[in-house]
């Protein structure tokens, strides 16, 4: 960190444990655009105006009831003192009836203050939770429309951190900061008025401490800011490492990379710990220094108050009340320092949430088309595409798929096969040329309608934590149990399902690790069969199953592809011998095109690939 040399703060000894000793502490991080972020947040708060105004009113009432207390208590002290003096002089006695009634009134004031504070807290908790609920809901909806390119530039851990940690920080900080801000300002004004009503000289002594407090706040915030800025970002990186290590734990163990993984985590964890420790160390100095200033105010009040009492310009009750007010005056000033840190943290977390919500969405034309004719005719016309502007993957790709045809795409790893499928699904838009379905450019299609016409089976299976029945039904939620089981039989997975405990009600765990890779693939194929979409995308769907299972799947696939336009990316070339057209891709270009027999007869790149696979098998 470049800023570390600016302020010499000793590096703390790192504490082991999750995220070091500091854990996930992020308080005090400064937002890049504090004012802009707060304006956006006010838009969310404005949705709950009545509740917020009511909370403010109850907070003000609570403070007012609390502020009046020392004044009343001072009157009781004066009355008691005067009564005792009169009793000693034999001219009177202590008026305990008046004192009892006054103390009863004081008790009612404090009870009313507590009730108002309780109601205010209940209202603000409701407001903050509703705001967090709305933000999480908007984030969930946003994920569905954010382009794939966004996730290429952001780790899963970073996105999850925005959804969980940042929203939680917002909720906690908003509730705390709004309450403290309202009560602190109200208390400062109210206490100042009460102190002026008691003694102008004593008030002047107390107010003299404000410039010192302001200087301390400014200096501490200034020096702590450099260490606040990276905390939220580093936390996202830490979460990303944790998510990645958890998902790839088997690979880490197999390749004995646990130590390297721990070292990388420790490196990021050290950054989070050091920046968090230093920022909190500096901001933590604020309270002791503010207490020092407050104590100096006490000393000044005692000295001046004693002089006023000796000259008869102040009563003992006045001095006692004023000392209480001095404490009530310095406390909210200190709280404003905490509010400053809390609001900086809140703004930083909120800014990250708003950054995600403001991320570019997948373009959707207002007049997007939903063609009545089901897709079957697909045409790539001189398509050019690259994930980044400086690296083109697809250079000049052209091909045409007639309705019901099976188009097989083969080629070495990195040739651009899967990229073509992503373009067809419009996860990305082409950089040049056009891609048309039923004669309509996919950029003019309604995205949901376009994707809803394709069933997909990918090499990387995705199953969620639910029963096998519900995982298959995911392809068509309204399907009956009989239809689910029919799809499973077509995918040749009915037999192994019945061997599991519970059969179709067998619960798949997270990541689907209680099924074999081949079994998971069969379930995803059954899901695609049940979906019964007019077009199919099979991305090396049989590459993770054994030869016997592959034969079973292939027979099911042959029947499934009848009458449907199918795009098949194949690793095992033996599975695409019956394809209507085989496209051989290398470096983003078509180098060969034809049927299986035609390409073998040519003796080119495809023939070499095909023969090499059989040579390896032999």
Task: Name these PLM-found stretches.
Residues 47, 51-64, 75, 176-230, ...:
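Transmembrane helices of ABC transporter permease
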Residues 52-116, 196-201, 299, 310-316:
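Transmembrane helix-loop-helix hairpins at lipid-water interfaces of multipass membrane proteins
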Residues 47, 148-149, 167-174, 178, ...:
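An intracellular "coupling" helix at the cytosolic face of ABC transporter transmembrane type-1 domains
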Residues 1-66, 81-102, 119-124, 128, ...:
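Membrane-integrated ABC transporters
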Residues 20, 39-42, 50-75, 106, ...:
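Alpha-helical segments in transporter systems
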Residues 83, 194-208, 222, 278-351, ...:
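Helix-loop-helix
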Residues 37, 45, 124, 142-189, ...:
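Juxtamembrane loop-to-helix connectors within ABC transporter transmembrane domains
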Residues 2-6, 365, 371-618:
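ABC-type nucleotide-binding domain
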